Amino acid sequence: MATTSDLRTNMIIRYNGQLHRVVEFYHHAPGNWRAMVIMKLKNLETGKTIEERVRAGSEIEIVRVEKRPMQFLYRDGDVYHFMDTETFEQIEVPEEMIGEPAKFLKENEMADILFYDDNKILGVEPPLFVTLQVTEASVAVRGDTATNVNKQVTLETGAVISVPAFVNQGDYVRVDTRTGEYIERIK
């Protein structure tokens, strides 16, 4: 058994008999009390996020998860279709299982699918950064450059993000899929 000192963000653990993803955690030692670890956990079955306090050094059960790289094929409503490039096996993943990064998935891009017990899908980990084309962008008004001016643009996947005023329609931008933030313009 592992202890709370082995915790890492995005780790899958079994807590109270159910599978949870560690969203965040931190060690807290209040004055003359015993140290504790405060964990924010996302239940993989219900999707609910809870905050739990456990004594530092408590035993936790880390679940072994298999990551398989798969190619994103297409989206059909709220269902995303992925294919294993070695076996050509196709799977369907509901949008709520992917979460916020779903809006940055581009067709034919690779993503890691997390499996438990060989066939149960736990989630999808898209690449940390993706390069997408800007399909719609408002024109920056001359004279609005006294401060850092951001504008909203629509990307080829339909996602809307905030970018600096110099980004125009047709430009390629790099986006962080974890936060949805603009990183840089690609030339």
Swiss-Prot record:
Keyword flag Magnesium: no
Subcellular location: Cytoplasm
Pathway info: Protein biosynthesis; polypeptide chain elongation
CDD domains in alphabetical order: S1_EF-P_repeat_1, S1_EF-P_repeat_2
Keyword Cytoplasm: yes
Principal localisation: cytoplasm
PROSITE patterns assigned: EFP (PS01275)
Assigned keywords, A-Z: Cytoplasm, Elongation factor, Protein biosynthesis
GO biological process: peptide biosynthetic process
Molecular functions per Gene Ontology: translation elongation factor activity
Gene Ontology cellular component terms for the protein in this record: cytoplasm
Family: Belongs to the elongation factor P family.
NCBIfam families: efp (TIGR00038), PRK00529.1 (NF001810)
HAMAP family assigned: EF_P (MF_00141)
Protein function: Involved in peptide bond synthesis. Stimulates efficient translation and peptide-bond synthesis on native or reconstituted 70S ribosomes in vitro. Probably functions indirectly by altering the affinity of the ribosome for aminoacyl-tRNA, thus increasing their reactivity as acceptors for peptidyl transferase.
Name of the protein in question: Elongation factor P
Organism phylogeny: Bacteria, Bacillati, Chloroflexota, Chloroflexia, Chloroflexales
Gene: efp
